Amino acid sequence: DLIAFFSSPDLKSWTHLSDFGPMAATGGCWECPDLFPLQTPNGDTRWVLIVSLNPGGIAGGSGTQYFVGQWNGKEFIADDVQTRWIDYGRDNYAGVTFSNAPDNKRIFLGWMSNWDYAAKLPSPIWRGSMTAPRDLQIIEVSNALYLSTLPISELKATHDHSFEISSEVDSTITVGDDEEKIGLSLVGHGAVLFVAGLNYHNWS
């Protein structure tokens, strides 16, 4: 439940500057911190500290919280002690950001898994996937600053090829003496609705 800040003139000799925490969501291991500046809607600069937590996530298991505040070169001072989460789902952990992106964007990429079940995934070599890259921005809501995460605009290029489906397809597959009924409905009108059903031995 602690983030320690160090400085070094040569990346060999290190000097302890300050500690941050514990506060907000605690009770697990704090790891994978990331500290970076972002502009607020009125043009001021605030610093964001991202902290991954395991256990203690909002949805159980591991999760990622963040703090908005000031960095004076030696210590990080949060604006408040409110718990703020990057995600409210279970599958985003240990995320880091990339600087020097086009248009001065701050790009976030996380691990799409959770330590509650990561070791049980049916993959022999890897454990989970990476999240879609997101563009991080600071927004203001009710006089408080929050972190907004949106898919990067470059992902729109993957949506150039689209089509609409406005029909229903139902199929019956017979294997030996057993009958399996599979119903599939695809309806597209601005959005795609996917419905699937299975009836096997009168079970649906």
Q: Could you tell me what each predicted segment is?
A:
Residues 4-27, 67-87, 144-149:
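Blade-edge beta-strand/turn elements of extracellular beta-propeller
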Residues 76-108, 112-204:
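Extracellular glycan-recognition regions
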Residues 33-41, 96-100:
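Beta-propeller blade termini
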Residues 26-33, 89-94:
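Repeat-based blade/solenoid architectures
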Residues 1-6, 16-24, 32, 36, ...:
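Hydrophobic core segments of beta-strands in well-ordered, beta-rich domains
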Residues 4-10, 62-74, 123-138:
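Beta-propeller blade signature
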Residues 38-41, 47, 54-75:
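Acidic, glycine-rich loop-and-beta core segments that form the ion-binding/anion-interacting portion
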